[in-house]
UniProtKB/Swiss-Prot annotation:
Name the record gives this protein: Protein DOG1-like 4
InterPro entries: Seed_Dev/Stress_Resp_Reg, TGA_domain
Signal peptide: none
A Pfam cross-reference name: DOG1
GO biological process: DNA-templated transcription
Knockout mutant characteristics: No germination phenotype.
MF GO annotations: sequence-specific DNA binding
Gene name linked to the record: DOGL4
Coiled-coil annotated residue ranges, if any: none
Domain of life: Eukaryota
DOG1 domain segment(s): 9-229
Organism: Arabidopsis thaliana (Mouse-ear cress)
């Protein structure tokens, strides 16, 4: 049985479903651009800008929501179980996109030596940042595992005035630490995405963004289908 959603979860669920629908529309445009070699560089850059703006809008909405309830983003109700299972600190793992670039290189994307060097430097920097965040996150693993304490405070169950105050103070401290970690992880995601787009040419950016959007859309479809079959 699914847990009752709070207002933050309801609002972000509505936002995210709309955001994904728009992502699918942009994916369609990316695929047209990829298959149509007649588009100018200016047109490609305009399309790339629309995608980056769309991603920035997601993080703007996300950061506003986590200020109200960061715990809602761990085991998010707007994601299916497969999407949640693939999540790294409430989002995609930055180093994953380099494997995506590697697959594109093996298939059809040709990079010059300078691009390869810059990508490798960015890969090393991204991995370093990931590991730094993971070390910080270890401090919160024990507290995060005890969701019963969290739900007790959020549902307002009273087990004695002083005890409740202690629990609520612990949850506030936990939430502040988690918000810091989530924002740090999101910043690495955004820096990695920008870094890759700065290195690739406009046609390569279109192909990369199409691959990334396809993965996200297909993961959601597979997860929804699997969840529907399991619960039907």
């Amino acid at each position: 049985m699914s847990k009752m959603r709070n207002l933050v979860e309801e609002k972000f669920l509505e936002f995210y479903e709309s955001w994904v629908i728009q992502l699918e529309l942009y994916l369609h445009q990316l695929l047209i651009a990829h298959n149509n070699n007649t588009m100018s560089e200016t047109e490609l850059r305009h399309l790339i800008s629309k995608l980056t703006t769309h991603h920035k809008a997601y993080y703007t909405a996300k950061w506003a929501a986590i200020r109200e309830d960061v715990l809602a983003f761990f085991g998010s109700v707007w994601l299916n179980p497969l999407e949640n299972a693939c999540s790294w600190l409430t989002g995609w793992k930055p180093s994953m996109v380099f494997r995506m670039v590697d697959r594109l290189r093996k298939s059809r994307v040709v990079l010059v030596e300078a691009q390869v060097k810059k990508l490798e430097e960015l890969r090393v920097k991204t991995k370093f940042d990931e590991q730094k965040i993971e070390r910080e996150m270890e401090r919160y693993q024990v507290a995060m595992a005890d969701r019963k304490m969290v739900e007790l405070a959020r549902l307002g169950c009273h087990v004695g005035g002083e005890s409740v105050m202690v629990v609520e103070a612990a949850v506030r401290g936990l939430s502040m630490g988690l918000e810091k970690m989530v924002k740090a992880a999101d910043c690495v995601r955004l820096k990695t995405l920008k870094g890759i787009l700065d290195i690739l040419t406009p046609p390569q950016c279109v192909e990369f963004l199409a691959a990334a959007a396809t993965f996200q859309v297909q993961l959601r479809r597979w997860g929804n289908r699997r969840h529907y079959v399991t619960h039907s």
